[in-house]
């Protein structure tokens, strides 16, 4: 996701390669990033943050303690930490880095192609201008929604953060179902992918609610109605709700666990 951010910023010319420095312990990764984007690369977190307006934390939760230790005492008062580390709370970041200007965001994987959505929040010390900058950075990857309460970040994780996996799972099931009907897998994948893509675009452009669009497709006594009956009898809505509640609970658990 860190690469998604820098790629989006460079593609949309919101900054220049010289404005970006990345710290990574993996030599092949550093070599790739330097060649691909022309940015500065280093293994030293302290060097990477020098003269940067925003310090992006794009590391796995288990690597957060080491990263925060490197940042402690090195950040200038006007620098902002933008964390996309899943399940890592603002309190954890603030305590570890000894810093109070923090933006916490939860993007999702479609950000890699500029079609993501990020939920985010910020501490009260983050200025209006810095919030605008955070909005610009996150918006470069797609859309963004600001929340006053950090608790919503766990909910965002359950909806849009984990959401792509839900759609992949449903797509898998539809593809397998099409194969069972007799289609070869290539044709099954094409039918399902274009149906999902077209439906998403139609839902985005139509003023109608999803339920109304569904009813438009569902003729009384027809094939779609029969399929919908099976979904409803199997408790699809309840299953989806239960899954999202479980994801939200897990996000809270991860936030309560010291990384």
Region roles according to the model:
Residues 1-36, 40-43, 179-181:
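NAD(P)+-binding Rossmann beta1-loop-alpha1 motif at the extreme N-terminus of oxidoreductases
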Residues 20, 48, 184-191, 213:
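Small-residue helix-packing motif on alpha-helices
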Residues 27-28, 37, 45-120:
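Rossmann-like NAD(P)(H) cofactor-binding subdomain of soluble oxidoreductases
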Residues 93-101, 117-155, 166-205:
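Internal alpha-helical scaffold of NAD(P)-dependent oxidoreductase catalytic cores
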Residues 102, 152-158, 210-215:
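Short pre-catalytic strand/loop immediately N-terminal to key active-site residues, enriched for Gly-Thr
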Residues 193-259:
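NAD(P)-dependent Rossmann-like dehydrogenase/reductase catalytic/cofactor-binding core
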């Amino acid at each position: 996701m860190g690469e998604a951010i820098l790629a989006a910023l460079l593609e949309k010319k919101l900054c220049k390669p010289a404005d970006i420095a990345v710290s990574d312990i993996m030599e092949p990764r550093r070599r790739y990033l330097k060649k691909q984007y022309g940015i500065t690369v280093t293994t030293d977190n302290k060097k990477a943050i020098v003269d940067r307006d925003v310090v992006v934390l794009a590391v796995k939760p288990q690597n957060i303690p080491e990263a925060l230790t490197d940042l402690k005492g090195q950040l200038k008062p006007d620098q902002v930490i933008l964390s996309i580390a899943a399940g890592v709370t603002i309190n954890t970041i603030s305590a570890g880095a000894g810093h109070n200007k923090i933006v916490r965001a939860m993007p999702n994987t479609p950000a890699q192609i500029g079609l993501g959505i990020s939920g985010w929040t910020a501490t009260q010390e983050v200025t209006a201008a810095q919030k605008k900058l955070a909005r610009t950075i996150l918006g470069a990857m797609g859309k963004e929604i600001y929340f006053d309460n950090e608790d919503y970040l766990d909910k965002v994780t359950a909806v849009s953060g984990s959401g792509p996996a839900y759609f992949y799972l449903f797509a898998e099931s539809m593809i397998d179902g099409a194969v069972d009907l007799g289609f070869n897998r290539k044709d099954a994948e094409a039918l399902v992918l274009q149906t999902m893509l077209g439906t998403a675009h139609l839902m985005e452009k139509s003023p109608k609610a999803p339920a109304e669009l569904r009813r438009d497709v569902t003729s009384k006594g027809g094939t779609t109605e029969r399929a919908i009956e099976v979904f409803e009898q199997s408790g699809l809505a309840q299953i989806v709700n239960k899954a999202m509640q479980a994801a939200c609970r897990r996000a809270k658990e991860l936030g309560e666990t010291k990384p």
